[in-house]
Regions:
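The feature captures the beta-strand-to-loop junction immediately N-terminal to the Walker
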Residues: 7-9
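Helix-to-loop junction immediately C-terminal to a conserved catalytic motif
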Residues: 22
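Conserved ABC transporter NBD signature motif
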Residues: 30-38, 47
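Conserved ABC ATPase "signature" region
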Residues: 71, 86-104, 129
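Conserved ABC ATPase signature
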Residues: 82-83, 108-112, 116
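Hydrophobic anchor residue at the start of the ABC signature
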Residues: 122, 150
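Catalytic Walker B motif of ABC-type/P-loop ATPase nucleotide-binding domains
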Residues: 133-137, 142
Length: 170
């Protein structure tokens, strides 16, 4: 697996490129391929089984608990209306532990700091268990300790990582 860094100044299109890769935007020209298949011809669920995203900004219109947010990462592996099972909860608990947020599982997402929210979103991506991980400025809201933790974690993952990042020292 490899780590691909997208580097550039503010406004250079890093996030726009990533949004094309993770289907928020459709390219004006050309196409994005994933495993040899044009991304926009795949179902959203199929592409979500292959890549997880940690976006720069994450908003929820409802106040979910941390555990509920991370459980959303399991959705691509489920049939319609299939309930979460013991294996899902085990995966979620492990993901929360990996990002040092296990003690926050029952807190609501909106009560967390920006850095804590970013770590929960990373846990959601880990719970998704995909071969590729897209990171859009993943260290934006993190203090230096958690920036280093995140980058060390990313290095250990056996997945392809595409990341836009500002700080080349991390």
């Amino acid at each position: 697996k490899e780590l691909v860094g997208i580097i550039g100044p503010n406004g250079s299109g890093k996030s726009t490129l990533l949004k094309c890769i993770y289907r928020i935007l459709k390219p004006d020209a050309g196409a994005v391929y994933l495993d040899g298949e044009e991304l926009h011809s795949m179902s959203v669920k199929s592409s979500a089984r292959k890549m997880a995203v940690v976006a720069q900004h994450n908003y929820y219109n409802f106040d979910f608990t941390v555990r509920e947010v991370v459980l959303m990462g399991r959705a691509p592996h489920k049939k319609t209306l299939e309930r979460d099972n013991a294996k899902d909860y085990q995966i979620v608990d492990e993901a929360l532990k990996t990002v040092q947020m296990e003690t926050f599982a029952d807190r609501t997402f909106s009560t967390l700091s920006g850095g804590e929210q970013q770590r929960v979103i990373l846990a959601r991506a880990l719970a998704q268990q995909t071969p590729a991980l897209i990171l859009d400025e993943p260290t934006n809201h993190l203090d230096i300790t958690h920036q280093i933790m995140l980058m060390e974690l990313v290095k250990k993952l056996n997945v392809t990582v595409i990341s836009a990042i500002h700080d080349l020292n991390i």
